[in-house]
Structures are given as C-alpha cells and as structure tokens.
A protein has these predicted regions:
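Glycine-rich segments within core transmembrane alpha-helices of 12-TM secondary carriers
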Residues: 1-17, 200-212
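Helix-loop-helix hairpin linking two adjacent transmembrane segments in secondary transporters
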Residues: 4-53
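Small-residue (Gly/Pro/Ala) motifs that create kinks and tight helix-helix packing interfaces
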Residues: 12-24, 97, 129, 212-220
Length: 248
C-alpha cells in the first residue's frame, strides 16, 4: 500500500507542470491553478471523511514517545534515509533545469522537461516496485537500486550529450522511486507495537526537502552547479550503506 501511495503521489507530481501549462494556456494566468488545487483538496477531504477506518485501541501519541524512538539506532538510520531521500529529490529537481541549460546549452524551458522526465520514471518505478518487492527482499532491491542510482548520477555529472543526460535522469527516477516506502515499511516492522509513534516520526523526514537544497545552493555559489551535485551524490552513498544494514 505504501508503494501504491507513492505511485499516486508520483503521478500527481508528474501532472503538476502539465496542469500549470493548461491553466496558462486556457485561462491566460497560471496562478488560476490554485483554486483548482483547492477544489481537488476539498473533494479529497469530503471523500476521506466518508470512509470508516477500524483501528485497534492505542494510546495517544505524545512528543515524549516519539523522542524515545530516536534512541533506537535502527529507527534513527531509517529516519535519516527518508530525510536524505526527500532532500535528494527536491535538491536534484532544483538543480536540473539550470544544470542542463549550462551543460548542453538548452533553453531553460526545454531543460525543465528533465524534471517531468524524472517524475515520469518515478511513476513507472513505484508501479514496478510494487510488483518486484513482492518477489525479492527489500534489502536486495534497495541495494541494487542505490548502486544503479550512483552509476546514473555519475553519468549525469560526466556526460555532455543531452540524450545521455535525460536517460541518466530517467534511471535516477526509477532507482529512487521506492526508497521512502521501503524505509517507512521497515521502520513500522521494527516496532509494530508503536506504529503511531513510528509513523509520526517518519513523516517528519519530509523536512529533508528543506535541508539539502540550501546546502547545494551554497556549494553552487562557491564552486558551480556541477559541484553542487556531489551533495545528492553523498546522500545516495549514505542510502547505499544503509541498505546493507536493512533487516530482511
């Protein structure tokens, strides 16, 4: 279910730029997309409000209960994987248009298509991951994915041909599509009796999207856009090491 949820999220991310383009073309102002987003959010809330969820009785989640989880090294490692995976994606998507524009002399609007290509691959990756993860262990899957992602990022940083760069982005999207779901699921399995606290802590990991991009910006200002890509590279390397410690 986590992987399926990530699939739906990836589809929404991929459609975001398309909807903005439609709003600009049809209504003449891309900002008019926000009322549409508000309507979709309202309809989603009304739909969810009608659902009945049977939950077992559990104690309310408190800040103290969440903090105690941080003393568990395994949980802390999985949290850091989620932080870095979200930071990797946001940081990379922030850098891709300018990097492609500088690397291949592409117009910025065409270079920005690299982000849509990444999310297209991520959509395919989450869908495929739901099938593959039912057949092999999440540890092996994550290890192979991170190895391929490192190779793809290395190719992205060294190639100069636009086709090769777009292909590398596509592979990156495929390889990084299921990191969040795997880490989240592993955390829940490690402490099944504290699912609420674990869920609350893992969701906090999305804050990683606000951590890596500023660091990449500092590196880019000091050494250029190419050098800033070493930041997500280090994140991938950490996730590779963490995958080797994942419990089957």
């Amino acid at each position: 279910m986590l992987t399926l949820g990530q699939f739906i999220k990836a589809v929404c991310s991929m459609l975001g730029p398309v909807l903005v383009g439609v709003a600009a073309g049809v209504w003449g102002n891309w900002r008019l997309i926000f009322p549409l987003y508000a309507l979709i959010t309202l309809l989603s809330w009304l739909w969810m409000a009608r659902l009945k969820v049977d939950e077992s009785h559990s104690e309310p989640v408190g800040a103290r209960g969440v903090r105690t989880l941080l003393t568990d090294g395994y949980i802390l490692m999985l949290l850091s994987v989620i932080v870095l995976s979200v930071g990797f994606e946001i940081g990379l998507m922030t850098a891709v248009p300018k990097y492609l524009s500088e690397r291949c002399s592409l117009p910025l609007d065409r270079a920005a298509m690299g982000c849509s290509l990444y999310y297209l691959a991520r959509t395919a990756g989450t869908f495929g991951g739901a099938v593959v993860l039912s057949r092999i262990s999440s540890r092996r899957f994550l290890t192979v994915s991170m190895l391929l992602a490192l190779v793809a990022l290395g190719l992205f940083m060294t190639a100069a041909d636009a086709t090769v760069l777009f292909a590398a982005l596509f592979v990156l999207g495929l390889c990084c599509a299921n990191v969040f779901a795997i880490a989240f699921s592993a955390a829940l399995k490690s402490a099944p009796g504290r699912a609420n606290e674990v869920s609350a802590l893992m969701i906090m990991g999305v804050a990683g999207g606000a951590l890596l991009p500023p660091l990449m910006g500092v590196v880019a200002d000091l050494s250029g856009q190419w050098a800033s890509l070493f930041v997500p590279g280090v994140a991938l390397l950490y996730m590779l090491v963490a995958s080797l410690k994942l419990k089957n």
